[in-house]
């Protein structure tokens, strides 16, 4: 699961693949599920609606310290994601980012039951089991709430940066006050004609070091900061963005603008999962607690999206849930085989895959 195995929505061709298990959600629990699938000798593919693995940990609080992961006194959320990526990298399972799982169709034949899963990017998967590790649901960006914004989306208005080259030599306005907004403002100032960061208040929800670097860059004349909110977007008759109006304490200012990047954060919603025929309660999927299987046999749920009595929303709980779920999923993928438990320290085959040797 190196970067080479991570494909985004801009990949040229949709993927068609047969796999033992499809993991929906590439946050920490989904990444550990991939590792567990590898331990069990199962084939696996992960899909995620976000443009990179890590889920909430990467998108919402990458610098947040975590203190309750076994054997780690402390680590940041991003460090945890990086460690999980490294752990499952030897299995080289593909992570398909920027695409949302849309439909789950049951396929029945003389050989048993399988599922046909399609995504928003046109991918089609034939799998023996589906494991939903979607956290609080599919994340979507908070959009610019101006009537003229919709027509500019995808052309000059962006909610993520996928290709820095398109901003080379452009006048770029970045709206937002979190880590992503500051990180991209600092990065793009090196290639854009001019970068202006716009935020509604002086305080930021970002790492102190990033805030300090941004303020130093403003003082040095490398970029601009404007206090206020987007109030209007100006464009030519053919739909080319030319300006962004900012309303601040002293009235309205129009910034010359070729490209607008709005990084207001993400909102979560169950998304298409509500149509997958699994029992849900208060936006979460109910599961039984022997294998965390949903009301639809062969479809499992783990992590924050799973609901059962005395459920604890902890990452370590999700790790346990996927370990149990995959052992039942193994039966569906290999109905003629018996899964024999082997301790990892005695599993020579696993050690070879992980490129380690027992002492």
Swiss-Prot record:
<keyword id="KW-0274">FAD</keyword>
<feature type="binding site">
    <location>
        <position position="61"/>
    </location>
    <ligand>
        <name>FAD</name>
    </ligand>
</feature>
<dbReference type="InterPro" id="IPR036188">
    <property type="entry name" value="FAD/NAD-bd_sf"/>
</dbReference>
<dbReference type="InterPro" id="IPR050097">
    <property type="entry name" value="Ferredoxin-NADP_redctase_2"/>
</dbReference>
<protein>
    <recommendedName>
        <fullName>Ferredoxin--NADP reductase</fullName>
        <ecNumber>1.18.1.2</ecNumber>
    </recommendedName>
</protein>
<keyword id="KW-0521">NADP</keyword>
<feature type="binding site">
    <location>
        <position position="101"/>
    </location>
    <ligand>
        <name>FAD</name>
    </ligand>
</feature>
<feature type="binding site">
    <location>
        <position position="304"/>
    </location>
    <ligand>
        <name>FAD</name>
    </ligand>
</feature>
<dbReference type="InterPro" id="IPR023753">
    <property type="entry name" value="FAD/NAD-binding_dom"/>
</dbReference>
<dbReference type="Pfam" id="PF07992">
    <property type="entry name" value="Pyr_redox_2"/>
</dbReference>
<feature type="binding site">
    <location>
        <position position="139"/>
    </location>
    <ligand>
        <name>FAD</name>
    </ligand>
</feature>
<dbReference type="GO" id="GO:0004324">
    <property type="term" value="F:ferredoxin-NADP+ reductase activity"/>
</dbReference>
<feature type="binding site">
    <location>
        <position position="48"/>
    </location>
    <ligand>
        <name>FAD</name>
    </ligand>
</feature>
<feature type="binding site">
    <location>
        <position position="345"/>
    </location>
    <ligand>
        <name>FAD</name>
    </ligand>
</feature>
<keyword id="KW-0560">Oxidoreductase</keyword>
<dbReference type="InterPro" id="IPR022890">
    <property type="entry name" value="Fd--NADP_Rdtase_type_2"/>
</dbReference>
<comment type="similarity">
    <text>Belongs to the ferredoxin--NADP reductase type 2 family.</text>
</comment>
<comment type="subunit">
    <text>Homodimer.</text>
</comment>
<dbReference type="GO" id="GO:0050660">
    <property type="term" value="F:flavin adenine dinucleotide binding"/>
</dbReference>
<keyword id="KW-0285">Flavoprotein</keyword>
<feature type="binding site">
    <location>
        <position position="56"/>
    </location>
    <ligand>
        <name>FAD</name>
    </ligand>
</feature>
<dbReference type="GO" id="GO:0050661">
    <property type="term" value="F:NADP binding"/>
</dbReference>
């Amino acid at each position: 699961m190196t970067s080479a195995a991570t494909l985004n929505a801009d990949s040229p061709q949709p993927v068609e693949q047969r796999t033992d298990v499809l993991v929906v959600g590439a946050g920490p629990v989904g990444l550990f599920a991939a590792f567990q699938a590898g331990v069990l000798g199962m084939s696996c593919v992960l899909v995620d609606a976000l443009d990179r693995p890590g889920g909430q940990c990467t998108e919402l609080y990458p610098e947040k310290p975590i203190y309750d992961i076994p054997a780690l006194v402390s680590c940041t959320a991003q460090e945890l994601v990086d460690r999980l990526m490294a752990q499952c990298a030897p299995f080289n399972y593909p992570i398909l980012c920027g695409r949302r799982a849309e439909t789950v169709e049951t396929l029945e034949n003389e050989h048993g039951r399988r599922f046909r899963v399609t995504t928003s990017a046109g991918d089609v998967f034939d799998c023996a089991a589906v494991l939903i590790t979607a956290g609080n649901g599919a994340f979507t960006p908070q959009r610019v709430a101006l009537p003229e914004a919709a027509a500019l989306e995808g052309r000059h208005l962006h909610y993520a940066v996928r290709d820095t080259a398109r901003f080379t030599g452009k006048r770029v306005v970045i709206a937002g006050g979190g880590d992503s907004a500051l990180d991209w403002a600092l990065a793009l100032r090196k290639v854009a004609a001019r970068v202006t960061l716009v935020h509604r208040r002086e305080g930021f929800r970002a790492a102190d070091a990033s805030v300090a670097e941004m303020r130093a860059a403003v003082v040095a004349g490398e970029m601009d900061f404007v206090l206020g909110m987007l109030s209007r977007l100006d464009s030519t008759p053919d739909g080319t963005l030319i300006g962004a109006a900012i309303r601040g304490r002293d009235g309205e200012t129009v910034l010359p603008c070729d490209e607008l990047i709005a990084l207001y954060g993400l909102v979560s919603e169950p998304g298409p999962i509500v149509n997958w025929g699994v029992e849900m309660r208060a936006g979460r999927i109910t599961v039984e607690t022997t294998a965390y299987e949903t009301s639809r046999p062969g479809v499992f749920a783990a992590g924050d999206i799973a609901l059962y009595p005395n459920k604890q929303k902890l990452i370590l709980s999700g790790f346990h849930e996927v370990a149990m779920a995959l052992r039942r999923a193994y039966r569906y993928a290999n109905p003629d085989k018996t899964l024999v438990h082997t301790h990892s320290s005695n599993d020579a085959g696993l050690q070879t895959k992980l490129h380690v040797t027992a002492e």
